[in-house]
A protein has these predicted regions:
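Amphipathic alpha-helical segments
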Residues: 1, 19, 24-27, 141-176, ...
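Intrinsically disordered, low-complexity and often Lys/Arg-enriched segments
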Residues: 1-10, 14, 189, 196, ...
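Short, flexible domain-boundary/linker segments around small modular repeats
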Residues: 1-3, 11, 115-148
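Non-catalytic DNA-recognition/assembly elements of restriction-modification systems
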Residues: 16-53, 176, 211, 219
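Positions in alpha-helical segments
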Residues: 15-17, 95-98, 135-139, 155-158
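A short beta-sheet element
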Residues: 55-116, 125-129, 133-137
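Low-acidity, Ser/Thr- and Arg-rich intrinsically disordered low-complexity segments
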Residues: 172, 176-209, 215-219
Length: 219
């Protein structure tokens, strides 16, 4: 988010790029003004079930009770604090993962889009394992538009995410087919160089290396 200046030289809280049908400034809030941050809890007293349990690394196991049912964005309390992810449905979270709920003037999907733009490592409170506190998150200032504009932005961003995910799947399916066709005994790895990602296949039988450049969208 940046500010622009109108013809009267007044600073306006609006993005440089915007859908043309929307006008008016985005309003500044603290996160705590528009949603609540929920704490995860221990799940070991629960029985096995069909409700997923999430930690900072993603899915862990399934239990028979839910901590919350609905749309949410998860954000790590400890560990991977800079990888928020969206979920819709019943779930349980452990105490290393926060979740959002009780939205007021902000939609759950736009919350996810907004959380993707925050430099969470900037708010790290530990010298060892990265950590965030609920109090710190709640005080972060954000700018949000009206609900109609939020919905349009979120619809576009989720469509892009889906397209990227599809391209990832197609790439790895093609790669597996290539490996199978060559009957390779390989080590499959990837590395990033600048904005580009490369995948390389090491064949221990024939002793050769194949390096495949991949779009920066596929990691």
């Amino acid at each position: 988010m940046t500010t622009t200046i109108n013809n009267e030289h007044k600073k306006l809280n609006v993005p440089n790029l915007r859908f043309p049908e929307f006008q008016g400034e985005w309003i500044t809030y603290k996160i705590k003004d528009v949603l609540s941050i929920g704490n995860g809890r221990d799940y070991k007293h629960l029985s096995n079930g069909e409700i997923p349990v999430f930690g900072t690394g993603g899915y862990m196991t399934s239990v028979d009770e839910c901590l919350y049912d609905g749309e949410t964005t998860f954000i790590g309390r400890k560990g991977s604090i800079n990888k928020p992810f969206y979920y819709n449905g019943k779930f349980w979270t452990v105490d290393t993962l926060f979740y959002t709920h009780s939205f007021n003037g902000i939609t759950p999907k736009f919350t996810y889009c907004l959380f993707q733009t925050i430099n969470w490592l900037k708010y790290n409170e530990a010298s060892g394992v990265p950590s965030l506190s609920k109090d710190t998150i709640e005080k972060i200032k954000i700018m949000i538009p009206g609900l109609e504009e939020q919905n349009k932005i979120a619809k576009l961003m989720f469509a892009l995410d889906e397209r990227i995910s599809t391209q990832k799947i197609l790439f790895w399916v093609s790669m597996r087919s290539f490996i199978a066709s060559k009957s390779l005994a390989i080590l499959l790895c990837s590395f990033a160089l600048g904005s580009n990602t490369f995948v390389f296949l090491i064949d221990f039988k024939e002793r050769f290396l194949i390096v495949v450049p991949v779009s920066s969208d596929v990691k």
